[in-house]
Structures are given as C-alpha cells and as structure tokens.
C-alpha cells in the first residue's frame, strides 16, 4: 500500500459494489488476500467476509476456502477490511488501517462479539517513518507495536484511555464523511455539546472536531 503512493492510477474506480465504491487501490489488495486465504485454508477451512468480494461466479458475498467447500463445514470466519480509510490514503493524505478479526464459524449466526483474535495495522502515508500494529486475543490482553519502516525494528507501547470527565477542551466528533449526512450530523453534534457542557461559546472554541 505504501509503495502504491508512487502510482497515478490508485484513485481510479475499479467497480461499484453493493456496499461502496471500490477503487483501484482496494482491488489491488484482493488477489493478495485471496492467495493468503487459499494457503491458510489448506490447514484451516475458512469463510472470508470482505467488502466488495465476489465468488467465482461474480456474486458478492462471503467466500469459502478451499474452493468447493460448504460454508457450514468451515472452521472459522475471517472478517477483513483490508483498507479502512481508502479515500485518505489513496491521495497520500492520511494513514488508513487494515482491520481483521477471526471468529468461530456459525454461518449467518456469527456475530462480531464472537471474534477471538483481532489485528489493527496502520497503513501509513509515504512520508511516515513508523506504523502502529495493535492485536488482541480474547482473554490475553492487547499487544501494541510501533514498527520503524526504515529497518523494521519494533518498539512496544501501551495505549491508555483518557482520564477526562468532560468533552470540554477535548475532541468530540460525529462522523459525516459524505454530502447528504452533514446537516443531520452537525445538528446532532450541536445537541450533544449543548447537553454535555451547555451552549457552545464560539469565542472560546473548547470542543474540537476531527473526522479522523
């Protein structure tokens, strides 16, 4: 993904799925993901759930590995968003994230709360020097690593939750990335601020907004 910043075609539309617009930078990941699942399924039959993914017949939906296996016979479901934040990273504007989770396969009854292993990996911009990787196994806590992109050295760190008791002098956001939702989102943000700290004083600007 970092190397793709040098290409001019990464922002081209590859196709329109039922869930979103799929760009070239997204579709370039699919063959890599499919090859990985083909190899993994030799030892662990799995169901891959990913946005815009289609089966051999071009039908969007979960894909079973190895090919030909019934979905109910797979051991696990792998839920993946290879690039969460496509639009920011494809213009080299800000980091995106690669998200993955693994849950026991219960077919259509499988729920996100049943995920046993999860990994969140930063996909940095071309000018970044380091990238964060956060992973967790149910019952075993979280492992956080910061990878130096120059020499692949790793530094461990421990994220902490904020101790703030108010949103005053802090960030508060209602995501509204696309036109069509901005008016409602703005009204909701104003309502939240008014309920939590009272009417916002624009001369003080004590509540900050950051869509990312």
Where are these regions (language model features)?
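N-terminal subdomain of lithium-sensitive/metallo-dependent phosphomonoesterases centered on the IMPase/IPPase/PAP
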Residues: 1-83, 208-211
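An extended, acidic
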Residues: 2, 115-117, 121-212
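Alpha-helix termini
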Residues: 4-5, 38-45, 104-110, 125-126, ...
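Alpha-helix capping and helix-coil boundary motifs
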Residues: 17, 108-111, 166
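Short amphipathic alpha-helical surface micro-motifs
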Residues: 28-31, 79-84, 116, 150-157
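Short, flexible, glycine/charge-rich loop motifs used to bind or transfer phosphoryl groups or to couple energy/partner
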Residues: 66-68, 108, 160-162
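DPxDG-like acidic metal-binding loop motif
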Residues: 71-139
């Amino acid at each position: 993904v970092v190397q793709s910043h040098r290409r001019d075609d990464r922002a081209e539309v590859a196709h329109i799925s039922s869930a979103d617009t799929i760009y070239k930078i997204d579709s370039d990941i699919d063959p890599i993901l499919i090859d990985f699942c083909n190899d993994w399924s030799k030892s662990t039959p799995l169901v891959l759930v990913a946005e815009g993914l289609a089966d051999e017949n071009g039908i969007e939906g979960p894909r079973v590995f190895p090919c030909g296996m019934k979905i109910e016979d797979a051991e696990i479901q792998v839920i993946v968003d290879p690039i969460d934040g496509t639009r920011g990273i494809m213009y080299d504007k800000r980091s995106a994230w690669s998200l993955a989770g693994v849950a026991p396969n219960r077919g259509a009854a499988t729920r996100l709360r049943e995920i046993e292993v999860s990994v969140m990996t930063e996909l940095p911009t071309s000018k970044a020097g380091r990238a964060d990787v956060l992973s967790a196994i149910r019952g075993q806590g979280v492992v956080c690593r910061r990878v130096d992109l120059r020499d692949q050295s790793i530094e461990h760190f421990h994220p902490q939750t904020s101790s703030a008791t108010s949103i005053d002098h802090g960030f508060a956001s209602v995501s509204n990335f696309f036109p069509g939702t901005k008016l409602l989102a703005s009204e909701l943000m104003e309502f939240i601020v008014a309920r939590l700290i009272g009417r916002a004083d624009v001369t003080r600007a004590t509540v900050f907004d950051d869509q990312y």
